[in-house]
Amino acid sequence: MSLVTDLPAIFDQFSEARQTGFLTVMDLKERGIPLVGTYCTFMPQEIPMAAGAVVVSLCSTSDETIEEAEKDLPRNLCPLIKSSYGFGKTDKCPYFYFSDLVVGETTCDGKKKMYEYMAEFKPVHVMQLPNSVKDDASRALWKAEMLRLQKTVEERFGHEISEDALRDAIALKNRERRALANFYHLGQLNPPALSGSDILKVVYGATFRFDKEALINELDAMTARVRQQWEEGQRLDPRPRILITGCPIGGAAEKVVRAIEENGGWVVGYENCTGAKATEQCVAETGDVYDALADKYLAIGCSCVSPNDQRLKMLSQMVEEYQVDGVVDVILQACHTYAVESLAIKRHVRQQHNIPYIAIETDYSTSDVGQLSTRVAAFIEML
């Protein structure tokens, strides 16, 4: 059963946001508004926002420019890194082209070396992320890195960031997080109210919506409509409920979601950077602003952190809240931290929750679509 409303058209608008958003970016540039590009959820967006800049996620989820990237980078490197670099080098990403500053981060060794080459053709500021998040030294490092970013932004754009402006940015970003979370929490409904593909269209597409007030209002209205229609009986057929974890997913990696839903499952939740990992926790709006920002961003359960207890905690929470029947761990080829951590995730899911787990290694090509479908079909049949 499919939802017979105009909601699918709205979902498609979010899906197309990346393609159409460059017109908005051109308008922002013509109005003299600074643009800051980012690749990672660890980047504290509130800091450039407080300087009046617009933050945009840069292109990194297609194999379109990987061949060009491999002229400079190793072939056996994560496709996300090669895609990021390739889009920048070729100027095929309008968001990169119009960015006044790119903020990178040391979430993996490949990325931090890639940023050295990227800095040859674009201003790049790299934040040094601590490997651990539990000790005072790591926390002090991250607070210092946020202040260093603030100084770079202030000098780059000639705009001093006040505490009031930072608090306003925190409040606005929190409202956006809550609106997104309220939307993807619809995945907790059983039977589902909408497919995982539609959830992903909206959550991924929202990163290319730059008017945050309009985005918040649109998300709130859409969430209310979906929930109302579900309560009126417009529901999808019951199927095995799948939680996706692992590497960032969007663009070419959406083939995993399609494989799941074309073979009899529903993706009801995303624990990864595209979903709850980046959005579930807000920044405290009281107390010291830098302490509050540090608390939020150091709570991101990324595999680059050791130990990564926060990821296990969030997985447990989502398995229960989303009534999950199986977990699919998506690992991009040559992503060492997520690949190594997959054993810990498998043990946790099976031993703590007694539900099936499968790890899927993939890249941005279409060459493994058939194999993906076969493996996923067997996994779902087992459920």
Curated annotation (Swiss-Prot):
Protein name, per record: Putative dehydratase subunit YjiM
Organism: Escherichia coli (strain K12)
InterPro entries the UniProt entry points to: FldB/FldC_alpha/beta, YjiM-like
One of the record's GO molecular function terms: lyase activity
NCBIfam families documented for this protein: double_cubane (NF040772)
Domain of life assignment: Bacteria
Known EC number: 4.-.-.-
Coiled coil: none
Gene3D superfamilies: 1.20.1270.370, 3.40.50.11890, 3.40.50.11900
Keyword annotations from UniProtKB, A to Z: Lyase
Family to which the UniProt record says this protein belongs: Belongs to the FldB/FldC dehydratase alpha/beta subunit family.
The gene coding this protein: yjiM
Pfam families: HGD-D
